[in-house]
From Swiss-Prot:
The gene is hutH. Contains an active site 4-methylidene-imidazol-5-one (MIO), which is formed autocatalytically by cyclization and dehydration of residues Ala-Ser-Gly. It catalyses: L-histidine = trans-urocanate + NH4(+). One of its GO terms (biological process) is L-histidine catabolic process to glutamate and formamide. Keywords: Cytoplasm, Histidine metabolism, Lyase. This is Histidine ammonia-lyase. It comes from Hyphomonas neptunium (strain ATCC 15444).
Length: 513
């Protein structure tokens, strides 16, 4: 398995993507003196005997309660146990791994006051594939992702359930099997440092971002095939049009659409004497819509990359002056905004894809047999797959409502404005799954429609895509059970096979120089 070294404060997006895909994180040893220095600063701050939030006081609304020195370990244990109040299904393993890696780099900046052995245990747990069970629901994204991260901290002290190589076990049993030892106690500040932060929301948002990147690339591929199937023009993809407007995402998307269609005999067949003046927007405006989505995703990526490398704890420890400063870096509003942008992009990618499906199955718009079946009437063809796509689009429209505009006071109004980042980020994988199905249906419909143009061939890239889908799904000559075909085509979208089939460099989150 690939190991990724994380240097706190400067981890690139490619490393977070690799961790989402299953790589194992290892913290850069160069940050160890910084971590140790931060823990020593906490001890010096405590020695002054003054109240410092979260170190020798209660939490939230109880911040005015002073805790005696002999109860500081109990204070940290209590916050972990009491805050582990999440509900719902366990979060996916790759989300949990990403969350823990984010927390490691956050703590590795040396502003949280945790000990080296605390971070070392997190790294060892990830290396052993020993993952805390993190209930998916319960965070409002301020004061950080308290409940999810509390469940992580519980596992680290041997409490609750975990997954060891995918098997659900008690934490105590799993640590024994893995040959690891949980922390016997949490030092001053450590419980709060583990709980405070946006790592769960950020992990979910990054997961949604990486899925959205793949989906956008897939949509450009299926959209190009639909353009060919509809005998659409590539003239609207002329670079001069897009350079005049100036949006980089739009320019990038127009470039790849033009490249994907280059050399097509289908396009050449209607280059002259075409009675149609303009294609419908779902064909003609692909660069504008996909480009705007790409721009949103790139903006979200910038925000999430900054958040991933930043420190979202409270209070923050400054060893050079032995200060503990209280602030609000735990408020996940930047993550919530980024998640909302990703949701908007996913929704629109699916929406315009469904419109291309609807165009292809409508003989008045496509000029092909109704519902893309050779014998309409006796056969219904792609009638209901389009309905399924419409249903999925409608679901995504509801989920795309911005989560960040909602807030509800918590903790006796001490935490009176919250971000809802966790909810906003968690929905992204559900939305992405819906768009995968929509694009899978478009891939089927576009491949079927291109069959009606035989013996004319499309471009080499799009013919390779058609050949790949035909390995799994034969042409629809007569009605048959459609569900397996949709699952097979969606599998090509979800696995990235559809992208790889065209063998072209597609627009990515990291814009080409």
């Amino acid at each position: 398995m690939t190991t990724i070294t994380l240097t706190p404060g400067s981890v690139p997006l490619s490393s977070w993507r690799a961790l989402w895909q299953g790589a194992t994180p290892k913290l850069d040893p160069a940050c160890r003196p910084t971590i140790a220095g931060s823990a020593s600063a906490v001890a010096r701050i405590l020695s002054r005997g003054k109240p410092v939030y979260g170190i020798n006081t209660g939490f939230g609304k109880l911040a005015a309660v002073r805790i005696p020195d002999d109860q500081l370990e109990m204070l940290q244990r209590n916050i972990v146990l009491s805050h582990a109040a999440g509900v719902g299904e366990p979060s996916p393993a790759n989300i949990v791994r990403l969350m823990m890696a984010l927390k490691m780099t956050n703590l590795g900046r040396g502003a949280s006051g945790v000990r080296l052995e605390t971070i070392d245990l997190m790294e060892a747990m990830l290396a052993a594939d020993l993952l805390p069970l993190i209930p998916a629901q319960g965070s409002v994204g301020a004061s950080g992702d308290l409940a999810p991260l509390a469940h992580m901290a519980c596992a680290m002290i041997g409490v609750g359930d975990v997954f060891l190589k995918g098997e659900r076990l008690s934490a105590a049993s799993a640590f024994r099997k893995a040959g690891l030892t949980p922390l016997p106690a949490l030092a001053a500040k450590e419980g709060l440092a583990l709980l405070n932060g946006t790592q769960f929301s950020t992990a979910c948002a990054l997961a949604g971002l990486f899925e959205a990147e793949r989906i956008l690339q897939s949509a450009l591929v299926t959209g190009a095939l639909s353009t060919e199937a509809a005998k659409g023009s590539d003239a609207p993809f002329d670079p001069r049009i897009h350079e005049l407007r100036g949006h980089r995402g739009q320019i990038d998307c127009a470039d790849i659409l033009r490249d994907l269609m280059a050399g097509s005999a289908i396009r050449a067949s209607h280059l002259e004497n075409d009675t149609r003046v303009q294609d419908p927007y779902c064909i003609r405006c692909q660069p504008q819509v996909a480009g705007a989505a790409l721009t949103l995703l790139r903006q979200a990526a910038d925000t999430l990359l900054t958040e991933s490398n930043g420190v979202s704890d409270n209070p923050l420890i400054f060893p050079e002056t032995d200060e503990a400063l209280s602030g609000g870096n735990f408020h996940a509003e930047p993550v919530a905004f980024a998640a909302d942008m990703i949701a908007m992009a996913l929704c629109e990618i699916g929406s315009i894809s469904e419109r291309r499906i609807a165009m292809l199955v409508d003989p008045a718009l496509s000029g092909m047999p109704a519902f893309l079946t050779p014998q309409p009437g006796l056969n219904s063809g792609f009638m209901i797959p389009q309905v399924t796509a419409a249903a999925l689009v409608s679901e995504n429209k509801q989920m795309a409502f911005p989560a960040s505009v909602d807030s509800i006071p918590t903790s006796a109004n001490q935490e009176d404005h919250v971000s809802m980042a966790a909810h906003g980020a968690r929905r992204l994988l559900t939305m992405a799954k819906n768009v995968d199905y929509i694009l899978g249906i478009e891939l089927l419909a576009a491949a079927q429609a291109c069959d009606f143009h035989a013996p004319l061939r499309s471009s080499d890239a799009l013919e390779a895509l058609r050949a790949r889908i035909r390995q799994d799904v034969p042409p629809l000559d007569h009605d048959r059970l459609m569900h397996p075909d949709i699952e097979a085509a969606t599998g090509l979208i979800r696995s990235g096979e559809a992208i790889r089939a065209v063998n072209r460099p597609l627009p990515a989150l990291e814009a080409a120089p």
